[in-house]
Amino acid sequence: MKVVIDTNILINAAADESSYAFRILKEIIDGRIEACATHQTMSENRQMLRKLVRDREYKDLVEEFFRVLNVTKVYKPVNVVSDPEDNKLFESIAASGAEYLISEDKEVLAVEEYHGCEVVTPKDFWNKYKSDSDDGSAWSDWSHMLMGK
């Protein structure tokens, strides 16, 4: 599953380790979700987070996020929303084929869908992700029981 993460999600994850944003970040770092971004977006996020985040442990976690991030190249600039910085998120979608854009920005969320990618809040994403994960494991458990494996 490929996702694009808005910077506000990374910032919010630092504020609350029980938040959906933090849970998503951990799933990405653990390799269960693939996060995608353009090189430019990644560089800008790194700079912003260095200024805003003071907690050393969280800074290390964010650096791990950047290490596992799938960096893509922008092939075509887009103009989907009024904020040029937010348009870079949509460029990441177009370049990566991501299935979800996770954001808490109201203007970004108003788009709802772009190139087959759902634009969702962390809570909505988490609920869909866990529902898909639970369905798969239940089916797997059931099939193992029937097959005796």
Language-model region placement:
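Metal-dependent nucleic-acid phosphoesterase active-site entry motif
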Residues: 1-18
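The start of beta-strands in P-loop NTPase/AAA+ ATPase cores
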Residues: 1-3, 98-100, 116
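PIN/NYN-family metal-dependent endoribonuclease catalytic core
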Residues: 5, 20-50
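A secondary-structure boundary/capping signal
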Residues: 5-7, 38, 104-105, 121
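Short, hinge-like loop/turn segments at secondary-structure boundaries
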Residues: 51-56, 119-120
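Active-site neighborhoods of divalent-metal-dependent phosphate/nucleic-acid chemistry enzymes
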Residues: 70-102, 106, 110
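Acidic, PIN/NYN-like endoribonuclease modules and their adjacent C-terminal/linker elements
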Residues: 106-149
